[in-house]
Amino acid sequence: MADVVIVASAFGMDAVRAGGHAKWTSVSAAAGAGGFEVRRELFASDADASVEALRSLGNAMAKLGLWSVYSTPECLYTPEGVLDVYALRLALIEATALGARFVKLQLGGFAAHANAAAIAACVRGMSPRLVVENGQLEQGGSLAQFVGLFDALAREGHAGVLGMTFDVGNWLWRGVAPLDAAQQLAAHVEYVHCKTMNGEGTRRLASAPAADDAQFAAVLASLPPHVPRAIEFPFDATRIEADAAHYVAWLAAA
């Protein structure tokens, strides 16, 4: 059975910014989650990203029995396709202070050259595992980009230097069939963001997959069964604790 992670944003972005992450780690642990994803963009101020603050948050999570993911909205590659070494190093430093198992970045503008040796140099000796996520934008959300990235890493001699966060709902946002993406990228997937999309155009919103969603079930079946699965859809604000417990149990067994 896969570990289930709750992403901080599931509790509402405003609620997390106002009350901090620590409050919601307690709710996540009580719901039976194995991990919690800290979102840098939901910090109330830069002080929350200090080494001291992150270490304190990480220690509090460890006492609750939770492991962590550290998510930053920064991109691994600039829009011009250049490796952003500064963004990568900063993310690794902050994730290490938190004690995170994974550090997650967006892919950004990767084009052809991965600069794999430089990535390997950055992650060498660091505990957090680097993963990149398919996003909602054209740049960084293209199936061809991700196929090309992993081909380039292998070609440059560093095939296992990073893994992938597979966001089911973001493929839908980009108009890509998640099952097609899963079949092509499964070997590289180490973490799964679970959500679907409802609505049209810019009014699309993340939501929980239905219990009888055959497409979602097929995607999970195509991905490695042991990788952690994260809840990245909003809970009902009127029954957050009950919703969290329900979806943790459901996703663990899905």
Task: Specify the residue positions occupied by each region the protein language model found.
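Short secondary-structure boundary/capping segments within folded domains
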Residues: 26-28, 58-61
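Short, conserved active-site loops that position catalytic residues or coordinate cofactors/metal ions
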Residues: 31-41, 70-74
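Active-site-proximal loop/turn and secondary-structure-junction residues that shape catalytic pockets
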Residues: 10-12, 40-42, 74-76, 107-111, ...
